[in-house]
Amino acid sequence: MRILMVTPCYYPVKGGTETTVRNLAITLNKNGIKTDVMAFNMDQNRKPRWRGKTEKIDGITVYRIPALRWLPIHSRRITAGVNFVPGRFIDTLKNYDIIHFHELDFSFPFFSFPIKKPKIIHSHGIFYDFFKMHHISRFLLKHLAHLYIVISKKMKKEFMALGISENKIVHLPNSVDTDLFAPKGQKEDNLLLFVGRISGGKGLHILIKSLQHIKERIRLIVIGPPDQNVNYFQNILKMIEEENQRGEHEIKYLGAKDQNELVKWYQKASLFILPSFGEGFPVTVLEALACETPVIATPVGGIPEIIKNNETGILISPNNPKSLAEAIQHLLENKDLRYKMGREGRKYVMKWHSIENVCKKLCAIYEQLIDANKFG
């Protein structure tokens, strides 16, 4: 079986989807499923490069497509129009048994429509309101794939509401490398960790505001690349500077980090905080739990499917710095409870979200799709 995973951006671009695609491709290849990757040619800051190339990463063939038009609207996941994909790259698709599209960029599905191969659209975050309002985008979503993979049960309901048949939708949760993301060493008391794109939707500003309501001196580590909203990023840097000048807490922004550096902070942190306004099924929460780090997060997207309230973490309402502060204070004052939550979180991830278990399910999906369709 030969699989081509197609995604707008790929490693070394850092992000939840990019990490997921890379881990799946590596693990599938280890298990004897030949898997390669096709993506637009972007630098680490997602700026387009105008020339294509083919390279080997982790033993995987990566086809880099010239990014001839990269015009995001509403979200980095939904582009304005369809980016041009040269014919020589589309011809490459004929060499694979299944074309597995990641994210909701329609460039590759649109230009690959004539290729008679089984196709999957794998959504890592649904923008239900966008597709409900934009009829052409909704039409494309419904007709450019034979199967749809969603990462949360909530997302499955949203796809069905957009008119996609339930028997074409498969729920496959995100995964984590539980060998890499594993507990190690001692936790550092009062060390909080935020990992994610520095965007308004992730709610980092809420976390920074919450520190004013916490008694103990906090050390907050912030990791993640800036979003396209430069103003928000600059405001965050200003908030960090002002909080550090107050002297009651310490905040460090470290930028984007690769997995080998990132895991060290998960292992050290007392708590992982994600006060998002909206999510798909955040890999960062799985990474934290795999390292036995309890999570405080908001009940948005697929998060309630991961976090069992008061068992593996605490769920708090969005846009509520005081409520967040109370949850942080409660867990910092209860070390035994933190450790118990951490152990339960690791058990949960090992059972349901290890990369090995998820890849077994994905292989079964591939086999069923091939058996159900006849393609010449």
Each predicted region: which residue ranges?
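A conserved mid-protein helix/loop that constitutes part of the nucleotide-sugar donor-binding site
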Residues: T19, N190, R197-H213, Q234, ...
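Short, structured helix-loop element that forms part of the nucleotide-activated donor/catalytic region
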Residues: R49, I221-E248, N260-E261, L337
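Short His-centered aromatic/hydrophobic patch
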Residues: F101-S107, S123
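Short alpha-helical donor nucleotide-sugar binding micro-motif in glycosyltransferases
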Residues: A256, K264-A269
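Aromatic "clamp/platform" in nucleotide-sugar-dependent glycosyltransferases that forms part
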Residues: F277
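Short hydrophobic beta-strand element within catalytic cores of glycosyltransferases
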Residues: P294-A297
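Conserved acidic donor-binding segment of nucleotide-sugar-dependent glycosyltransferases
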Residues: N309-N310, I314-P321, H330-K335
